[in-house]
Amino acid sequence: MGSYLDEDEFNRWITTASSTLKSALNDAESGFYNWACFKAQQASEFSIKAYLRGTGNDSFGHSISMLLQKGNFDTAIINKAKKLDKYYIPTRDTDSWSDGTPEDYYTKEDAFDAIECSRSIITEIENKWRSLKSELKKERE
């Protein structure tokens, strides 16, 4: 492991992830299910970018599952991310649908499932970050 973690950069991005997840929950509770799904995706994307940037790694792209692979996360969490990856564009882009609007295609169940997936991903990332900090501290002792 490298000898430096950028705590400020991690905190900057993880704070954004947390507030975005809260906004997703507000949208879900207000019936804006497509926006809740999109924001759950965004919250997870921000959290993995927190981890990658905090460890000095590239964080280019929007696929949470691919970004998690760069961070060497396990398959179970990557599979949750694959659900969220599908919410990046069609949740907000009317061109994604031949009829109707994005609002017509997302349910309460979709929204709360996306939020739960996002919570799991964020928790996993926060736990891995704490573990890295602990390892680095031990290396320095």
Residue ranges and their predicted role:
Residues 1-141:
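Terminal alpha-helical segments
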